[in-house]
Amino acid sequence: MSKISTKLKALSAVLSVTTLVAGCSTLPQNTDPQVLRSFSGSQSTQEIAGPTPNQDPDLLIRGFFSAGAYPTQQYEAAKAYLTEGTRSTWNPAASTRILDRIDLNTLPGSTNAERTIAIRGTQVGTLLSGGVYQPENAEFEAEITMRREDGEWRIDALPDGILLERNDLRNHYTPHDVYFFDPSGQVLVGDRRWLFNESQSMSTVLMALLVNGPSPAISPGVVNQLSTDASFVGFNDGEYQFTGLGNLDDDARLRFAAQAVWTLAHADVAGPYTLVADGAPLLSEFPTLTTDDLAEYNPEAYTNTVSTLFALQDGSLSRVSSGNVSPLQGIWSGGDIDSAAISSSANVVAAVRHESNEAVLTVGSMEGVTSDVLRSETITRPTFEYASSGLWAVVDGETPVRVARSATTGELVQTEAEIVLPRDVTGPISEFQLSRTGVRAAMIIEGKVYVGVVTRPGPGERRVTNITEVAPSLGEAALSINWRPDGILLVGTSIPETPLWRVEQDGSAISSTPSGNLSAPVVAVASSATTIYVTDSHAMLQLPTADNDIWREVPGLLGTRAAPVVAY
């Protein structure tokens, strides 16, 4: 084992929180931003075509919108489509709106010298400073006036800002994760940014974003350990050079090294990496770093974690392996379970059971040593925090409750978490699931899908904030949700033609999964690193995530409408 690995393991031991279950059945102790345009100064690797002679007005406008995907040289490519006077007054940096598509219609009153064209489309997002995607769902309308200049049509009046069709965003920008630690210091959390593909300095863009800190949407849920004096100087002589890091102790420097190395590595920036802080190696003993040196912090390590499939059938839980179905012991086979979550690594089961007219949240080991920790009229399917350090459920459709073990008494305690919904969002929460990192929370409210950020206002306190609708195109059809290990959100719906959808965590894209032999509604969904499991109107089905579009019944559960539970 390398010296840095030894040091990392020691640090991890200090930072780690205790797991939800210790031994067989116990719960743990509680324990000057740069905008996107400033990154665009590097030259593009592609020559951009400008207006062509005798181009028709509608084609010229479409060429203008396409050129707006190139932010280099203050959007010089797009300005080539404007009249000379408008070039100096148009402000492309005002906003970047993403539309599903752009429709054009010439308005009445047009002449051979001047035309006004209406622009319409559904705005599905906005690209904010630093490449942050903010999902939207609103109709967009604007007008563009065109005049002839030297015999050629040019745009003479238009709204400030850039309009991009979603396809142009995908064709010319790529999402990259900038990594920040969760409050426990255990796990790196991706902060997704859309960056221009053809920048010749992607690594420097990423390091500048890292130093600038997390985006506003996720910042309440992660840690930014750098002071406002920190800055990224640049990439010089093979070194990533930073200043203003003198306040960081050894552990903080190690964490920052992990952030930088994994941010670069996941953007396919080749290592090894030399990180220099204030003129000296960031880590004095390790001037050059590789991902192997910091493997303990690999943000995708859990995507390779071994998982176990369980099935909830007729109110009882069973382990499913190679076609064999083995019922769990004791209370877990009592026939009264409505939903469940299982952590095989911590040997803990959390299940919502029904007793008479109330729901009961029961927690314990797989061997059956259990405790009833919550009772209420309704309780949502449980969900575990990272490393099973606590579990959550929503009571009576409105109050998230966190269950963990008190550091003072050693007893299981329930703490209500505050949830800050947008003003126009009302209705009961029918599904609530934490991401694998525990920093994001997805929920279904009145059939709509929302994602928020879990924050820690004080010791033992939790709040879910910055809640945004991420799949408005699904309407009110969502029934079930599950986070894939890679951070993609799976959504089961009642839509007959396409009952299962995948949603990017920032809401930038939504796409249907193969649905040839799926029958709506999809009332349950779960996933491992390699397989998606669902319960449709007939049975429990599985689909390998790689290059496969045929859903098949799960061996051992043929003809059975069980609900999948994937445990890690």
Curated annotation (Swiss-Prot):
Which family does the similarity line name? Belongs to the LpqB lipoprotein family.
Which species is listed as the source? Corynebacterium glutamicum (strain R)
- What SMART domains does this protein's entry cite? Germane
Cross-referenced NCBIfam families: PRK13616.1
Membrane topology category = Lipid-anchor
Where does the record place the N-palmitoyl cysteine lipid attachment? 24
Q: Which GO terms describe its cellular component?
A: plasma membrane
User: What's the name of the protein?
Assistant: Lipoprotein LpqB
Alphabetically sorted, this entry's keywords are: Cell membrane, Lipoprotein, Membrane, Palmitate, Signal
What InterPro entries does the database record attribute to this sequence? GerMN, Lipoprotein_LpqB, Lipoprotein_LpqB_C
Taxonomic lineage of this organism?
A: Bacteria, Bacillati, Actinomycetota, Actinomycetes, Mycobacteriales
Instruction: List the subcellular locations.
Output: Cell membrane
The positions making up the signal sequence are 1-23
**Lipidation feature positions (S-diacylglycerol cysteine):** 24
